[in-house]
């Protein structure tokens, strides 16, 4: 007999403002007619996402529609109610009602009874469970939740300066609600701890633990049985009434938990992200009272110190240069499973190995599960939203942010414990970040340390994602140093706005390629034209105006003035939206690639780089590698190119060509083919260099030096060939004899968020780039639910084909097919060159190819 059931209460919900409801929770949870005319909803959801789904408001992401939604609606509580059916047999079981996340407080009634009030459910990141065994019944059960919105000073969900604040503060039941039925003993907090033999990688010790709670009034004796593949282990347990006990299995008592030749979990480019399944069941008198399942990976995470200053990370003993970008959820927390899956695949497509979560994002475990499966490392922890008065709405401590009072310390420490227990089995999480811009107050950091010792000793933590160089006061006026753990060993010194390529290679004071830069980037990444037309009303598309600014960031990042000034200076002022689009994508590519490449080149003094940001919470102009509609910007393909495991790189600082090997093996008999072209596509220089690359290394293979006959704008073409002459990778640069000069003396005020340029490069000759004729053929092939496209390109002209942009369009709707996974894009072809480019996308609709480019006939 099996008594364990998990019932997800996701459908059949309705919501209504308490201002329109006179009945009490006891009435709402007994009389289904009260909510008959309320708005239909699902869970997880927020109040505003539900209103939008019911078309109460026009698309809040278009134009300035968001401004029309009154925040007063969300200053009162809102009701969520749902009914669910139980059989007579199910109603006789024990039951726990579990809330993974409610923002912010709640009173909960079930079948007329108050089972939890706002002192029990208090905080967006608290996870709560209630024994409702005596409250469930056969037939229809009604659950009513009064959700109380976050107030100024609450430790809620926030988006800092990335986008506008949601008018409802994301109030709602934003994570799953689960009814867990069991036979009296419940398995809670299952955990797998792995210890890898780092000398051989041929052995690993597995420790399995779980809490057993007896919810009955009688003593229960039974077996806790665990299974991992063919390995079975069990213990006989005797639980007194209402007792709770932590049960542990380890290899000392169960030799099967000493794994020989384990399949290790590795991040992308280092190996396969192998996973195992654990099944637990508690059996008493041949009846399964409860079960639990989880997935885990066998891996070892350690940190190390570079020159006693900079912190880095190792996975299974191998140093990993962290190459990542910062994630945000949808502004109304409306991410779908399909969207999350596409985004994780985009990360992999870009050759990134990490996502940073500033905030415990995710409506459920989907994001974390996918990162486990794809070998994407995760940095997970609190947001700086709680550290600054402008976001919290109340005064904060200059050094410690908003968490410094005893009652707040207890609240946040408990929320942290809940999140760690919720997520700790995900092998993709390699570090917990307990603060962002500041450090936790000593009492709070000690509570965090105690939580790690008790619940998760398997990975390091960071006391802050700021730290090294914090005396330079880029973010705030205080030094980011902990009294317990000292410096974090990582840095957060910007930049966050327009930054010239040379900066990343030459800067040794702020955000340049040394140490671990936990959030940085060259500023705005403008969406492609199709996306601009989706987010800005037609009449406001050109020239740029307030609607554009509304879709920028906040505060210092509320317009595009730095980006457009650089465009005007470097490329020439655009006279149309289409010209702006073309030049914006060129800048997206030009500015993003060198950031990642500089950290690749400087492997010996760099440990990590996180682009701020990866994605978009709503349609925006700033900080994104692909936009809200999942349309990659040119920065996406620049990142993809920069992070190739084997590549050639132009160093803007010393003007050398570097070869990069991200792999763990030696790469022998390689050849670099290096050519330089004028703006008229005349070859000015050519050389071939043979070399070998050590594992995980970079080295200079050629100094370009002073070349004769350069035009003001010129091109550098790099090809990496294997021992048979087959191309491994390519890279193409547009450079200027007028070198960009950084202005370190510029006065930017208290928040020195970037290093501007006082002299800009000159690419205006690109405006007269001679036209060329491009030939292409392509075909689509259906592969189950996926379509593949193969495109053969040939430059039939005598001039370089610059920034060829490939797009796939739905033939019926004319809309771009998204998401789409191109192996390369924004491609450059030499005269007479041919290249095959492939992509794949989901769907069966008839599609067609669009080919655009800077100088195509």
Map each language-model feature to its residues:
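Accessory beta-strand-rich segments of carbohydrate-active enzymes
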Residues: 5-7, 11-20, 46-54, 70-187, ...
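Substrate-binding clefts and catalytic carboxylate motifs of secreted carbohydrate-active enzymes
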Residues: 7-8, 14-23, 42-46, 102, ...
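Beta-strand-rich binding/interaction modules
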Residues: 108-110, 202-241, 247, 655-694, ...
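Extended acidic/polar, glycine-enriched regions
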Residues: 137-140, 209-305
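Surface beta-strand/loop "capping" patches
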Residues: 183-216, 308-309, 638-671, 750-793
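Terminal connector regions
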Residues: 258-292, 706-760, 842-857
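N-terminal carbohydrate-binding accessory modules
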Residues: 281-347
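Substrate-binding/catalytic cleft of secreted carbohydrate-active enzymes
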Residues: 354-555, 587, 591, 605-608, ...
């Amino acid at each position: 007999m099996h008594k364990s059931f998990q019932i997800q209460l996701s459908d059949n919900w309705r919501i209504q403002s308490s201002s329109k409801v006179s009945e009490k929770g006891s009435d709402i949870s007994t009389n289904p007619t009260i909510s008959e005319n309320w708005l239909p909803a699902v869970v997880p959801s927020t109040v505003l996402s539900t209103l939008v789904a019911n078309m109460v408001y026009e698309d809040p992401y278009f134009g300035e529609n968001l401004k029309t939604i009154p925040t007063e609606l969300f200053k009162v509580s809102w009701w969520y109610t749902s009914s669910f059916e139980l059989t007579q047999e199910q109603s006789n079981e024990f039951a726990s009602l579990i809330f993974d996340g409610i923002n912010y407080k709640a009173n909960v009634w079930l079948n007329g009874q108050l089972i939890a009030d706002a002192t029990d459910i208090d905080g967006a990141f608290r996870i709560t469970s209630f024994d409702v065994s005596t409250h469930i019944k056969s037939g229809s059960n009604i659950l009513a939740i009064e959700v109380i919105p976050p107030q100024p000073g609450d430790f809620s969900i926030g988006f800092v300066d990335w986008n506008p604040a949601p008018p409802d503060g994301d109030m709602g039941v934003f994570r799953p609600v689960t009814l867990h039925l069991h036979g009296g003993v419940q398995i809670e907090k299952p955990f797998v701890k792995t210890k890898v033999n780092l000398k051989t990688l041929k052995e690993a010790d597995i420790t399995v633990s779980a809490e057993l709670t007896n919810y009955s009034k009688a003593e229960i004796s039974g077996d806790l049985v665990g299974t991992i593949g063919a390995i079975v282990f069990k213990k006989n347990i005797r639980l007194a009434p209402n007792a709770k006990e932590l049960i542990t299995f380890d290899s000392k008592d169960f030799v099967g938990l000493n794994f020989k030749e384990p399949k290790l979990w590795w991040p992308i480019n280092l190996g396969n992200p192998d996973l195992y399944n654990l099944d637990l069941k508690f059996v008493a008198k041949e009846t399964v009272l409860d079960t639990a399942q989880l997935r885990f990976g066998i891996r070892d995470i350690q940190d190390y110190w570079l020159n006693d200053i900079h912190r880095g990370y190792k996975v299974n003993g191998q140093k990993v240069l962290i190459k990542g970008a910062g994630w945000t959820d949808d502004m109304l927390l409306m991410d779908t499973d399909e969207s999350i899956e596409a985004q994780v695949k985009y990360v992999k497509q870009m050759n990134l190995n990490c996502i940073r979560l500033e905030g415990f994002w995710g409506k459920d475990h989907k994001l974390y599960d996918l990162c486990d499966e794809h070998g994407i490392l995760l940095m997970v922890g609190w947001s700086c939203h709680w550290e600054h008065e402008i976001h919290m709405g109340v005064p904060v401590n200059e050094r410690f942010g908003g968490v410094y009072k005893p009652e707040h310390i207890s609240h946040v420490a408990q929320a942290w414990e809940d999140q760690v227990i919720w997520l700790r089995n995900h092998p993709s999480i390699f570090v917990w970040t307990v603060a962002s811009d500041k450090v936790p107050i000593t009492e709070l950091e000690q509570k965090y340390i105690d939580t790690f010792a008790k619940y998760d000793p398997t990975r390091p933590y960071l006391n802050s994602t700021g730290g090294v160089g914090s005396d330079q006061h880029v973010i705030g006026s205080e030094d980011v140093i902990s009294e317990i753990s000292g410096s974090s060993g990582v840095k957060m010194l910007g930049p966050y706005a327009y930054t010239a390529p040379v900066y990343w290679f030459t800067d040794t004071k702020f955000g340049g390629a040394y140490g671990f830069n936990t959030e940085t980037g060259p500023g705005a990444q403008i969406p492609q034209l199709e996306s601009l037309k989706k987010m800005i009303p037609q009449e406001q598309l050109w020239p740029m105006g307030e609607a554009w600014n509304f879709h920028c960031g906040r505060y210092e990042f509320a317009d595009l003035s730095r980006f457009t000034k650089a465009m005007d200076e470097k490329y020439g002022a655009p006279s149309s939206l289409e010209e702006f689009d073309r030049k914006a994508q060129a800048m997206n590519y030009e500015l993003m690639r060198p950031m990642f490449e500089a950290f690749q080149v400087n492997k010996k003094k760099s440990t990590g780089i996180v682009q701020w940001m990866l994605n978009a919470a709503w349609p925006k102009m700033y900080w994104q590698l692909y936009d809200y509609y999942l349309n990659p910007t040119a920065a996406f393909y620049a990142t993809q190119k920069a992070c190739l495991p084997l590549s050639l790189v132009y160093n803007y600082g010393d003007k050398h060509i570097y070869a990069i090997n991200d792999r763990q093996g030696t790469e022998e008999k390689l050849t670099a083919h290096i050519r330089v072209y004028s703006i008229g596509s005349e070859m000015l220089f050519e050389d071939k260099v043979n070399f070998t690359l050590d594992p995980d290394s970079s080295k200079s293979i050629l100094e370009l030096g002073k070349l004769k006959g350069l035009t003001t704008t010129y091109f550098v073409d790099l090809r990496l060939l294997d021992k048979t002459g087959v191309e491994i990778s390519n890279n193409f640069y547009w450079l200027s004899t007028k070198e960009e000069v950084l202005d370190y003396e510029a006065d930017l005020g208290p928040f020195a968020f970037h290093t501007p340029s006082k002299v800009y490069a000159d690419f205006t000759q690109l405006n007269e780039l001679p036209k060329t004729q491009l030939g292409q053929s392509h075909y689509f092939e259906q592969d189950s639910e996926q379509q593949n496209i193969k495109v053969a390109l040939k430059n039939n002209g005598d001039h370089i084909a610059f920034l060829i942009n490939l797009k796939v369009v739905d033939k019926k709707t004319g809309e771009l097919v998204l998401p789409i996974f191109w192996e390369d894009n924004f491609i450059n072809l030499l005269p007479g060159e041919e290249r095959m480019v492939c992509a794949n996308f989901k769907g069966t609709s008839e599609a067609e190819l669009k080919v655009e480019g800077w100088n195509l006939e």
